[in-house]
UniProtKB/Swiss-Prot annotation:
<dbReference type="InterPro" id="IPR036388">
    <property type="entry name" value="WH-like_DNA-bd_sf"/>
</dbReference>
<comment type="subunit">
    <text>Homodimer.</text>
</comment>
<feature type="binding site">
    <location>
        <position position="106"/>
    </location>
    <ligand>
        <name>Zn(2+) 2</name>
    </ligand>
</feature>
<protein>
    <recommendedName>
        <fullName>Transcriptional regulator ZitR</fullName>
    </recommendedName>
</protein>
<comment type="function">
    <text>Zinc-responsive regulator that represses expression of the zit operon in the presence of zinc. Acts by binding two palindromic operator sites overlapping the -35 and -10 boxes of the zit promoter. Could be a sensitive sensor of intracellular zinc to efficiently respond to zinc variations in the environment.</text>
</comment>
<dbReference type="InterPro" id="IPR052067">
    <property type="entry name" value="Metal_resp_HTH_trans_reg"/>
</dbReference>
<feature type="binding site">
    <location>
        <position position="23"/>
    </location>
    <ligand>
        <name>Zn(2+) 1</name>
    </ligand>
</feature>
<keyword id="KW-0678">Repressor</keyword>
<dbReference type="GO" id="GO:0003677">
    <property type="term" value="F:DNA binding"/>
</dbReference>
<dbReference type="GO" id="GO:0008270">
    <property type="term" value="F:zinc ion binding"/>
</dbReference>
<keyword id="KW-0479">Metal-binding</keyword>
<feature type="domain" description="HTH marR-type">
    <location>
        <begin position="1"/>
        <end position="142"/>
    </location>
</feature>
<dbReference type="InterPro" id="IPR011991">
    <property type="entry name" value="ArsR-like_HTH"/>
</dbReference>
<feature type="binding site">
    <location>
        <position position="107"/>
    </location>
    <ligand>
        <name>Zn(2+) 1</name>
    </ligand>
</feature>
<dbReference type="InterPro" id="IPR036390">
    <property type="entry name" value="WH_DNA-bd_sf"/>
</dbReference>
<dbReference type="InterPro" id="IPR000835">
    <property type="entry name" value="HTH_MarR-typ"/>
</dbReference>
<keyword id="KW-0238">DNA-binding</keyword>
Length: 145
């Protein structure tokens, strides 16, 4: 099979795997709480800092409306709470509830496990081969911009 066909199959497999997901994580989520990947990512963001809808949308590179929808679902599950900014009552700040902390930690661990798997895969190649792979991925990424 040609390299072009392999790339096409690889990207097709990624598209199928990532359909309707914000990110690609390997393995299964270990949390018993059923959340979308966007909701999980919001929890991970809020574990690091209190944030606004607009800031979350910016970080996730999704629309504020999509964030609002995800926040509403998280609030219904009592995983997040809202408060008003002390310096501007119009600004709504979102933060985690105690119930959400273990879920957010699990999502962060899932990220680390995925990165560790990528590192293990990379370690199967020599430094020179890793440089070629890195260059290829950089060029391929530029083609998508």
């Amino acid at each position: 099979m040609s390299l072009a066909n392999q790339i096409d199959q690889f990207l097709g497999a990624i598209m199928q795997f990532a359909e309707n997901k914000h990110e690609i994580l390997l393995g299964e989520c270990e949390s018993n709480v059923k959340l979308t990947s966007t909701q999980e990512h919001i929890l991970m963001i809020l574990a690091a800092e209190v944030s606004t809808n607009a800031r979350i949308a910016e970080q996730l590179k999704i629309s504020p409306a999509a964030v609002t929808k995800a926040l509403k679902k998280l609030q219904e599950q009592e995983l997040i709470k809202s408060s008003r900014a002390t310096n501007d009552e119009r600004v709504v700040l979102w933060s985690l509830t105690e119930k959400a902390i273990p879920v957010a930690k699990e999502h962060a661990a899932h990220h680390e496990k995925t990165l560790s798997t990528y590192q293990e895969l990379g370690d199967k190649f020599t430094d020179e081969e890793q440089k070629v792979i890195s260059q290829f991925l950089s060029v391929l990424t530029e083609e998508f911009r």
